[in-house]
Amino acid sequence: MRWEDFRTSSNVEDRRGMGLPGGAGGLGIGTIVILGLLGWALGIDPRILIGGAEMMTGGGSGYQQQQGRQGTPQDEMGRFASAVLGNTEDVWSTVLPQQANRQYQAPKLVLFSDATRSGCGGAQSAMGPFYCPLDQTVYIDLSFFEEMQRRFRAGGDFAYAYVLAHEVGHHVENQLGILPRVQERQQQVGRAEANQLSVRVELMADCLAGVWAHHSNQRWRSLEPGDIEEAIHAAEAIGDDRLQKQSQGRVVPDSFTHGSSEQRMRWLTTGLKAGQIQACDTFRASRL
Ligand SMILES: [Zn+2]
C-alpha cells in the first residue's frame, strides 16, 4: 500500500511506554498479545456487545484521564497508524455526508503498550485492538501487527490498515446509530441470537473497511498489486472458525462473534468493490 502521501491525523494520542500503576500483571507480553489476537477475532473487540455490560459499569467510576503525547509519532509504525487514520478521516468525511447525509465526527486513536485506561474500562494488549463507543476511541497496541505476521503469516501494511479500518468501521456504525440499537436488542435476546447480532456488526465493519479502501484507492491510488490478497488473507486467517479450530480443535458456530473466514473475506470484498455503505447492510442481507 502506498501510504506515504496520506495526511497524518491529529487525533492520535501516543501512550506507549507510559505503563500503568501496577502494570499488566504477571502475564508476559507474548502471552498477552497472542490472547489479543484471539480476542480480536473471537469478538472481544466491540466490548460493548456480548459480555460487555460489566465493562461499561466498571468503566465510568474508576476512569482516570491518562494523557499521552499528541502529534505524529516519529517511529515507522506509529506514523503508519497515524497516516491510515488520517486517510480514513479524509474518506469518511466525504463519503458519510454523500451516502448517509451525516457529518463525520472523527474518532480518536490511542496507541498504548501493555495496558491503559479507556472509556470502556481497563484496556490490555490481550484484548486486541478495539473501539470504545463511550469515548469514541480506537485502542491498539501496535505489537498486534507483529503478531499477525509472526503467528498467522498475515502481515503487510494493507493487512494492518484493514485492522485499523475495521475498528474505524465500528465508529462509522456508531455514527449511524447502529451500535446502540444492536446493544439494546442484545439485552433482550438469548445468547445465540446475541452472537448472531455481533457477527452482523463485525461483518459490517469488515465491509466498511472495504468501502474505505475503495475510496482511498480511487483518490490516492493507494492500492498496489497484492494488497487486496494480503487483506483477504488476513481476514481469512482471523476468521472465527479458523481460530476456534486452532484453539479448541472444533468449530462452534453459535459462539461465532466475528464471522467465519469465508464471511469476513466476502464482506470485505463486497465493500471494496461497491464503495457503498448501503452494500454493507448485513442486517438486511439474506445471506450473511
Ligand atoms: Zn470488530
Where is each model-derived feature located?
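A Zn2+-metalloprotease active-site environment signal
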Residues: 6-17, 24, 28-257, 265-288
